[in-house]
């Protein structure tokens, strides 16, 4: 959930709720799923992060991006622990997908509709990758760019 606010503006409770929803909820779900997967010695844990997780982002996105980065690192830690098991762990980094949750927001660059986004998510998940950027075009090259571009330029793109 991306309902964060700017840091240092008296919005701690809203930012905490964003962090709890995005990270603590994912942690609880991972705990439950991995327990089941360990018991059956198989499974595929799919963790949904965000393209926003790739860099620190300004303003209302700071807490959202940080919580999604935490989710991605949680998945990587779980994957590291399960490397020599039949349990797979995938981290999915969706770009902008228009859904009910954000239907009132302004249209964003490279945004796809819900149907296109869902098809891309399913296609990525079925391949059981370690990481996937969804939809792959343009988010795979955008992800690479986000990691190497100067922060000032990333801020303008966000």
Feature roles, as predicted:
Residues 50:
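Residue(s) in the substrate-gating loop at a strand-loop-helix junction
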Residues 1-16, 60:
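Conserved mid-core segment of classical short-chain dehydrogenase/reductases
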Residues 94-104:
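Short, flexible catalytic-loop segment of classical short-chain dehydrogenase/reductase
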């Amino acid at each position: 959930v991306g309902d964060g606010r700017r840091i240092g503006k008296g919005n701690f409770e809203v930012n905490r709720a964003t962090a709890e929803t995005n990270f603590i909820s994912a942690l609880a779900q991972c705990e439950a799923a991995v327990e089941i997967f360990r018991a059956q010695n198989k499974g595929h844990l799919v963790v949904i992060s965000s393209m926003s997780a790739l860099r620190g982002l300004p303003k209302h996105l700071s807490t959202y991006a940080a919580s999604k980065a935490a989710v991605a690192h949680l998945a990587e830690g779980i994957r590291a622990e399960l490397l020599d098991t039949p349990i797979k762990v995938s981290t999915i980094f969706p770009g902008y997908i228009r859904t009910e949750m954000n239907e009132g927001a302004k249209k964003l660059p490279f945004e796809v509709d819900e149907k296109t986004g869902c098809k891309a998510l399913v296609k990525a998940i079925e391949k059981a990758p370690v990481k996937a950027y969804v939809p792959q075009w343009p988010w795979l090259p955008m992800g690479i760019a986000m990691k190497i571009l100067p922060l000032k330029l990333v801020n303008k793109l966000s």
